[in-house]
């Protein structure tokens, strides 16, 4: 296999001290076991001179008064104000400390409720051992957790296969669909599979069943999908119209114009490089993030390139793509970059978190891999900060007054052919995706079994090896999507597109279907809890085992690097029975279920701080809301005011109290609501 494309975070758990599990009660009381529990046992790949520290909540006020709370990437502090901590860190030369999550006033109240404000990154001289400094800090009662800022590593240097005329010549036929005029839609079997793309191994219907779903909805620009991956090619002609735009930022600015802690974050942020410029042209960039983005929201019906699941219909924009870049050329992101990206996505409007990366499955063959986590507790207890960030997205993305309350995280299940999904995918709060081929069979590389919740088309290059030659062999059995021109070159008329495979390509199919469903709920003006949509996604999946031939082995050609050639291999489908999740994701069935569920949305009551303001977009509460104009009446203008600015209602708090108000659309539809103005700040100034 030459181009499998799910990112893995490699690490080796450090062994516990011999006999630690046999510690006596006396030793525990002396703090030996307690100190060990405070420090993550995983230090492999740790960045020198850096630690991630969570302080005890008892010293929160001390940190605030010392000004450390307001520290961030652009202004680290040099003292914590906690004497015992400062005494230790003064010994490690020139240390700096900053909050893991920069202050964003819009979300600070939630951050403090979740305890994320207690996490800090401490930097010190690289001459000192991170393990020794971690052990010293763990002895302090003021410190509740110490973790290492590990480097995230790509599991593979896989390469995409650019679309060429020679690849296209292998196609026996092209799927015909009147849906859109995008010229390569006929090659995207993963959306519309008529069973005739190749002479064999293509089964009609082995797709995401999106063609009928497009008649119901093609996406909505109010729905944002955050892509944690390599960067997205922001200049790609098939993607640029569906990129998320931070309207309060300035493109390529070095200033944090909107005060969210990140300068120049116009289409997202390059967390790996530490600036707002999203990049795709680095030496080790593979085009992975751009490929994922195209599956979700390449512009549909624009007469150009490919189609996507939720990319609009030509007259209406699709869902928006937020680039949260955690890999950038030769720069591999760290755990610090990853968790910042996750929280950033939640705070800036994303409701779907697309994650085509993870650790190695704990059930992976140790001859080929280094197995990692096998249980929920192993992963969660070893990666507390990572879990906290993901949990923040699950519970704080979206809005209780919006279409979706909470966020949905979709992970690739992994490519080790292991009988258990990798983590974090396998954790029950997330969607874990296995990959299938164009005939419904499990892809030869996919993880399956424990922790797997759903399947989706991910391609299967080795299985389609008889189609094509050399590097192009099997390409037509893979997923076709967008690629940066730095990957494909610019000379070919087919440049900007190509094939990849992996559970990391199955993953965005599920993320896109989720986003399409939320878009449809927006159209219907229905409200859902994220858990409700997640359950419906799984309940509406299509059973796939009925299409498997259990009487014979699935044959494929596996490229063996040591031998330099491909060898015939087999897999027994009986081993996969009941282990590919609830079935293959089904866009039409999912949207149909949404139509019959949920609660009708009404304009919410408004809460605004005294001398502050709250901004609400009314369009999601009204039929054809984006095309409407609005008027707002406030009964007591001494308490609050409202300015209508296009599709934004800006409420300002003038005096403490409550007042009745109403909002009316040009169509005549109206809602009554209450505005409450209150002092929302505590003694530290946080809302």
Annotate each PLM feature.
Residues 350-357, 406-407, 521-621, 642-644, ...:
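C-terminal subdomain of the subtilisin-like protease fold in secreted/lumenal serine endopeptidases
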Residues 24-27, 215, 219-221, 230, ...:
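Substrate-binding/access-modulating region of protease and related hydrolase catalytic domains
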Residues 106-121, 135-224, 232-238, 242, ...:
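Protease zymogen maturation seam
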């Amino acid at each position: 296999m030459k181009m499998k494309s799910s990112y893995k975070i490699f690490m080796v758990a450090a062994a516990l001290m011999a006999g630690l599990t046999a510690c006596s009660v006396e030793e525990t009381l002396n703090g030996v076991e307690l100190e060990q529990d405070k420090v993550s046992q995983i230090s492999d790949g740790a960045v020198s001179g850096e630690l991630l520290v969570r302080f005890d909540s008892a010293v929160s006020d001390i940190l605030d008064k010392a000004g450390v709370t307001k520290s961030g990437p652009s202004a680290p502090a040099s003292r914590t104000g906690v004497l015992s901590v400062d005494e230790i860190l003064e010994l490690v030369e020139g240390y700096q400390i900053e909050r893991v999550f920069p202050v964003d006033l819009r979300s600070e109240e939630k951050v403090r409720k979740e305890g994320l404000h207690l996490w800090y990154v401490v930097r010190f001289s690289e001459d000192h051992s991170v393990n020794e400094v971690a052990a010293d800090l763990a002895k302090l009662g003021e410190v509740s957790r110490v973790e290492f800022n590990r480097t995230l590593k790509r599991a593979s240097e896989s390469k995409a296969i650019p679309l060429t005329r020679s690849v296209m010549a292998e196609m026996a036929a092209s799927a015909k669909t009147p849906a859109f005029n995008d010229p390569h839609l006929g090659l995207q079997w993963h959306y519309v599979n008529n069973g005739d793309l190749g002479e064999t191994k293509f089964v009609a219907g082995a797709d995401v069943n999106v063609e009928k779903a497009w008649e119901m909805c093609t996406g909505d620009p109010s729905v944002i999908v955050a892509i944690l991956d390599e960067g997205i090619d922001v200049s790609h002609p098939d993607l640029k119209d569906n990129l998320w735009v931070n309207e309060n930022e300035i493109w390529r600015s070095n200033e944090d114009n909107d005060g969210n802690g990140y300068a120049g974050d116009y289409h997202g942020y390059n967390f790996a490089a530490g600036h707002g410029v999203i990049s795709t042209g680095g030496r080790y960039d593979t085009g992975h993030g751009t490929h994922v983005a195209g599956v979700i929201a390449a512009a549909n019906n624009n007469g150009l390139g490919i189609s996507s699941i939720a990319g609009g219909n030509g007259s209406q924009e699709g869902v928006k793509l937020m680039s949260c870049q955690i890999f950038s050329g030769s720069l591999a992101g760290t755990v610090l970059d990853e968790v910042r990206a996750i929280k950033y996505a939640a705070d800036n409007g994303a409701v779907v978190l697309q994650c085509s990366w993870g650790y190695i499955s704990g059930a992976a063959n140790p001859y080929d891999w280094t197995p990692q986590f096998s249980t929920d507790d192993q992963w969660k207890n070893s990666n507390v900060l990572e879990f906290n960030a993901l949990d923040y997205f699950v519970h704080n993305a979206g809005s209780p007054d919006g279409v979706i309350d909470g966020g949905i995280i979709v992970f690739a299940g992994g490519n080790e052919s292991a009988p258990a999904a990798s983590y974090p995918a396998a954790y029950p709060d997330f969607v874990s995706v296995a990959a299938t081929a164009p005939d419904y069979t499990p892809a030869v590389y996919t993880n399956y079994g424990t922790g797997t919740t759903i399947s989706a088309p991910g391609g299967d290059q080795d299985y389609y090896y008889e189609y094509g030659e050399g590097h192009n062999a099997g390409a037509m059995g893979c997923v076709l999507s967008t690629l940066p021109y730095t990957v494909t070159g610019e000379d070919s008329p087919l440049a900007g597109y190509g094939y990849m495979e992996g559970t990391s390509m199955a993953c965005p199919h599920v993320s896109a279907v989720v986003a399409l469903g939320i878009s449809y709920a927006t159209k219907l003006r229905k409200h859902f809890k994220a858990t409700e949509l997640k359950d419906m996604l799984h309940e509406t999946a299509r059973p796939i085992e009925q299409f498997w031939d259990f009487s014979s082995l699935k044959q494929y050609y596996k490229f063996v690097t040591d031998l330099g050639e491909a060898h015939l291999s087999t897999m027994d489908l009986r081993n996969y029975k009941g282990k590919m999740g609830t079935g293959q994701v089904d866009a039409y069935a999912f949207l149909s279920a949404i139509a019959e569920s949920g609660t009708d949305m009404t304009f919410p009551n408004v809460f605004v701080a005294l001398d502050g303001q709250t901004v609400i977009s009314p369009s999601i509460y009204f039929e054809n809301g984006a095309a409407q104009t609005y008027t707002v009446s406030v009964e007591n203008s001494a308490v609050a005011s409202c300015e209508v600015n296009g599709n934004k209602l800006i409420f300002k708090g003038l005096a403490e109290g409550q007042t009745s108000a109403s909002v009316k659309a040009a169509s005549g539809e109206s809602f009554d609501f209450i505005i409450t103005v209150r002092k929302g700040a505590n003694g530290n100034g946080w809302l």
